[in-house]
């Protein structure tokens, strides 16, 4: 649940780009066939109407009943993209992440330094704008 919530708030990629397959009108916007559409994943995954009033807060419990229970529209959860262009390495990345976290957390304890300033910067990938200073102790 913690990994899913982290990926919801801080997805590996900031955008998904898709080409419209046909002419379509969305609200008052005309989208022509072939037009590229950028989907800002971090914004989509923090919409209060989809994720609830605490959409901007870190709340791993929202995934207690899986993605279907976390979001009104499960397709809005797309940290690795969606559809035929989904990241081919997503399952490997999740397995690797779980193994590495298990190894690291079994040997070390981490805490943020008092001067830490939370500042995600949305670039090609999301990075901490001012870096992250951690205190590390052996477990």
Residue ranges and their predicted role:
Residues 39-68:
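Conserved cytochrome P450 K-helix/beta-meander segment immediately N-terminal to the heme-binding cysteine loop
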Residues 37, 90-127:
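Cytochrome P450 heme-binding "Cys pocket" and the immediately downstream C-terminal segment
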Residues 3-7, 59, 81, 98-106:
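Amphipathic alpha-helical interaction motifs in eukaryotic regulatory proteins
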Residues 36, 43-44, 84-85, 99, ...:
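Conserved beta-strand elements of beta-rich interaction domains across eukaryotes
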Residues 1-27:
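Conserved cytochrome P450 K-helix E-x-x-R motif and the immediately C-terminal K′/meander segment
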Residues 42, 109, 125-139:
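C-terminal helix/juxtamembrane-tail motif
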Residues 63-97, 120:
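Cytochrome P450 heme-thiolate "Cys pocket" and heme-binding signature region
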